[in-house]
Amino acid sequence: MSRDKPGLLAGAGRRFIMLLDGLLRRVSGIFEFSGDPGCLLRLALGRSRVDIVLSDGTTIHAGDPIGEIHLWNEHMPRMGSSGPDLTWGVRFYRGMMASLKELSNYVETDHQFASVKAFHGEVAVLQSEDVPAASQLLERLGFDTQAPKVPRSWLGRFRMFWENLYTWWLMWAFQPASLRGKNRRHLARFDMWISRAELVTRYGA
């Protein structure tokens, strides 16, 4: 029985992280816009933290309403111990294409998103060397990608520390095999943006 204790503790820890994730989603207003078990995305209505001009000319100012895209962790393809390989990338790409079609249809019919001109998400990868490949994959889907600004204030750095730690916990809970041999300090982030016009043009019905 004692040999099973580490596994039992790990299982309990993962269940706790999943429960915590569900609670934080509710508090943050993150919701499921699709009932498709293959949908990889959740959505929230948020406000931009930055001024940005997207590649199609769409201009977003800090404070403007935006759609916040979040991964639906329970639906993500499982990674192996080597992380996201080619097979995983193909499955993710196809899943994202289908999910973005559903997103386009949803926001065109929900009045809450009538004034939203762009959609934003934060992407985390296990090491900085993975950023170019991940960025290229998302750009093929129509996203603009951008390195986040490094916070200068201690409060910003403190926030980033906890965001990275929580992201690591989520990976441990939902994609545990992918963390073998990886170090949390090597976690890298970047932003992805897509304008409403680009989303509807590419993925609209």
What feature does the model see in each segment?
Residues 98-101:
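Transmembrane helical core of 7TM receptor-like proteins
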Residues 1-95, 106-205:
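Non-catalytic substrate-recognition and accessory regions of acyl/acetyltransferase enzymes
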